[in-house]
Structures are given as C-alpha cells and as structure tokens.
Amino acid sequence: LSKEKYITIVGAGPAGLTAAINLANAGFETTVYEQNQNAGLRFNGDFQGLENWSDEEDTLQILNRIGIKINFLCHPYSGNDGLFYGPKLEKVKVKTSRPLFYLIERGSDPNSLDQGLRKQAEELGVNILWGKNLESVDDSKAIVGTGPKAADAIAKGMVFRTSLDDIFIGFIDDKIAPKAYAYLLVNDGKATFATCMFEDFQNEKIYYERALRAVNTVIDIDINEPEEFGGFVNFFNEPKISKDNRILYVGENAGFQDALWGFGIKYAMLSGYYAAESIIHNQNYKKLCEINLLPKLKTSLANRWLFAHLYNPGYTFILNKLKTMDDVIPALKKHYNTSMSKKLVYQIAKHWYKTRLIDKQCMHENCDCVWCRHGKHAH
C-alpha cells in the first residue's frame, strides 16, 4: 500500500470508529489509537437516544447509508411508548408518524453501540491499539476524535434493574433540570434515569434528588441494583474542523454536538463518515462539514438560546402545543433545521454563549499535535 493508504485515527468513539469502518471498506489500512483498554469505558451501560426527528431520512437509513450495520441494541420508541411531564407534573402524550428516537446502550457490554462499532471495525481488519495515547502525528493525514474536553452541560443519573415495562418519560422543569430535562428510559428490564443541567452544576445532588422524587410521583417503579453515573457534553460556537485539511477533528472533540438537548451521537458518526469520505475521494473535509453539519449545529445553538429563555411557563406552553398535534415529527424537524429567523437568533446566541473549554496550546512552531488547535490552519 502507498503511504496515502495508511490512516491514523486517534480515539475509538463513535466518530473515530465510523471513520475507521468507512476507510477500511474503501481499502485503507487504518490504525486506531485509544487511550482506554476498551471501547465505551467512559459510560456505564446507560441508555441514550439516537434522535429521529431532525432529518427527512429515518436514522436507520442514515446509518445504513454511512456504512454502519445494526449489530447493537437499537430499539425504536414512538410517541405512544412514553410520556412527558411539565413543571406542574401535567401529563403530556405526543403522536408520531415514525419512531421519535432509537434507544441505544453505551459502554462496554456486548449490546452497546460502542462494542458494536468496535466489532464492525475489527471484522474489517482495522488495527485498534488499546491503552495507547498518541500525542502527535507525522505529515500524513490523521483523524482525531478524542471526546469532550470540558463540561458545557452535565448529567447525573443511575442505571438499575426494574420490572417496569418498556417506556420513556421526559421531564422539563428548571427546578429539577435547569435549562435542560430529566428522563427515564426502560428497556427489557434495564433502566436509565438521569437529570441534565446546563447551569448551576454545583447543586447537581439537589436537582438529582428532586428529579427522583418527580419520577416516583408519576410512576410506581422498583429500583434494583442501582449504580450511579455522571456525564458531560462539550460544544463550541464554531466547530474546530481541521488543521490544513490534514488533521481532521471529528465528534465532540470538534464540537459536533447538539447544543439544545445533547443528542449528538448522530452528528459524531456523520462527522466520522465525512472525514473518511474526504480522504477516500480527496475532498475538503471542512467544506463537507459546512454543507452537511454546520447549518444544524448553528441552529442548535440558536435553539439553546431560545430554550434557555423560555423558563417554566414557556415549557408548559410548548408541551401543551405539542400534545394537540397529530404528528410532532414535522414540527421538531422544522425546529432543528435552519431558517432565516434561526440565523438571526444564532447571531445573538454565539455572542451569548461561551464554551467552558480552555484551549491549551502547545508551543511547537510547526504544530503536528493532535490535542491542540493553534496555528493559522487550526480551523
């Protein structure tokens, strides 16, 4: 193989492994460096969602299009499968014409998304070096997906066993999830409960206890073998996409995250796909992202600003509006995609929001570091 056919990837998360799978399918010899000893070790077997409202295509079709097989738990949940509760614990049920989201598991269990992607990559001959941290690369192309670096939003929760039937419940109330939401996801006797916060992180324990009380108020649930977990998401005003179209940043490391509600896994996997496509077809990665990802990311920041200024009366109003619709998918799709009004709000939002990331820079004159973003070609 020529030197151009060897690709280095840093990070075995969804973005890095999606890139590796697509490169291997195209005949590239790919080596992935992962500092942990396995995929998904940042997670505790907690359930998350692949949202299914922002695109015309169903999310399963998108995964198929970007070369990903479903060899992991990926269970559809429609409006009929769950409930929402507003600040006064008023029950809201929504109608959907297709699954609202696909429930997936994160972590190192065999059914997790992380292990499914690992298996797909290894079956294609991708060489994954576990417990290896790569600080710099030579002058060849590299893809870097090393995950979030700072907490722009946090989650505190637990995974547990329960006899409750499969269900999802979402709570929107600043008293239990400031500027965010709390949720319960149950699938096949396993459950994840968490509350998310976009502010007032120091009081996470108080919000968590309040959220747990809210769950016990609206549903009779048995909690067995509970294990607590914490998590965080990180995003930027402007994603840092590449250095000189040579070091390509993917996933949350690059800022590909949903600033509204943190549904960023699809963005991460798509960024890995576009990074691979740019190498396979000799295209400009930055331009691919600007066309296919940035409009939604900018809209998500505009939506974050709008949501942060709704407060509890606004949440009640929105939920009441959603429950009158015959199908909430078109409304959510419109909300998640760009428009003239969202472009105007984005101009306000990008000045209002500053990421908590302190971007440490190296002092190398001709930077080839994978972790910093300085230099004229940084983004």
Model-derived segments and spans:
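FAD/FMN-dependent oxidoreductases across multiple families
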Residues: H75-P76, N203-C289
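Active-site-proximal substrate-binding core of FAD-dependent oxidoreductases
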Residues: W261, E277-F317
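C-terminal auxiliary extensions adjacent to catalytic cores
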Residues: N312-H379
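Glycine-rich FAD pyrophosphate-binding loop
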Residues: A12, A24-D46
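A short, Lys/Arg-enriched amphipathic alpha-helix followed by its capping loop at the start of a domain
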Residues: A19-F28, I62
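Beta1/beta-strand and adjacent pyrophosphate-binding region of the FAD-binding site
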Residues: S2-A15
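Predominantly flavin-linked oxidoreductase catalytic cores and closely associated redox partners
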Residues: A12, N22, N36, S108-E228, ...
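N-terminal FAD cofactor-binding segment of flavoenzymes
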Residues: A39-G86, K156
